[in-house]
Amino acid sequence: MLSTKRQGDQVQQIEVRTHAEGASLPREQQLAWKIASMAAANSSIDDDVTEMIGNRLIDNAAVAIAAVNRPPVRHARLLALGYPHPHAGGARLFGLPSGTFHCEWAALANGVAVRELDMHDCYLAADYSHPGDTIPPLLAVAQQVGSSGLDLALGILTAYETQMSLVTGICLHAHKIDHVAHLAPAVAAGIGTAMHLPVEVIYQSVNQSLHLACATRQSRKGDITSWKAYAPAQAGKTAIEAVGRARLGERSPSPIYEGRDGVIAWLLGGAEATYTVRLPAAGERPRSIMDSYTKEHSAEYQAQAIIDIGFALHARQLPLAEVEDVLIETSHHTHYVIGSGSGDPEKMDPDASRETLDHSAMYILAVAWE
């Protein structure tokens, strides 16, 4: 992939592993602290990055409005309607002309709306992600606390940088952990930037967010349900609550990544595993958002080319009914996540859920071809 980072940009390369038994790991050496330090220091944006942040806000709003009347989105709104904000402030909901609600519930409702059609931005590396999932919780918090547009933009930039750096350096799916485990700490870091919180508070927020967001990938296997849209929205809500608790002075489990009973040791590669995470060096402006990309079609990112192929075959008037067998030569990710390599018989069932079929290369090709 072509990176849009500028020549000469400096990064800090962080080696992350389980710390030795019987030894304490100073917080300044912990990944969560380094993320928090980056978040607290982020205070300026390049002009082209500012434009891209605007693009991502527009894209999120568009896909949310497209999904606004789908049942999972309506039900998420109903949950938020139970938590109107009693004072001045609060956050708005997609699909409602008025009213403000507690930001954590607005984040949930709006997060489901953005995620429902699987049509917002994407970033694939060692793991998978939709970094635009960070925007609904950040926007909700910004509305409730009255943040400026600049502070919101800086928060979004930090969240993208954090999530995409984690996705580049730490593979979750090989251990059947869902990618919301990278999303929640990214949201916490972004809120920290937007609210000008101290490193200590952001650090505790990142720890708690990750601790609570380590879900399995069953949400994306077998009979896939609307929880696929709720999972990132719930992670955003969790991050908001973590920040609220940390602001009151409460502490969280640490070292969350490197601890002997932490995430790496027991949920990822184990006590002997080492991961490399790259964050902007001190004084460097985050730019990872420039490496995210949007979709043309409402389906898994790896299905975009398959849909185009199906349309092309349809245009050539090749009758699908006369085809006995189709071989798709594709990537490892496509084969195992949306192809026959997934081992999910549900992906071959035309009556399966929408969430299942938008992750089925077989179904997607057939529909586009027809």
Predicted regions and their residues:
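Short, Lys/Arg-enriched N-terminal segments with co-localized hydrophobic residues
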Residues: 1-10
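Glycine-rich phosphate/diphosphate-binding loops and the adjacent beta-loop-alpha structural elements
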Residues: 288-298, 302
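N-terminal core-entry segment
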Residues: 9-290, 341
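Aromatic-acidic/polar surface patches that form glycan- and anion
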Residues: 127-130, 180, 299, 354, ...
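Intrinsically disordered, low-complexity Ser/Thr/Pro/Gly-rich interaction regions
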Residues: 14-19, 301-370
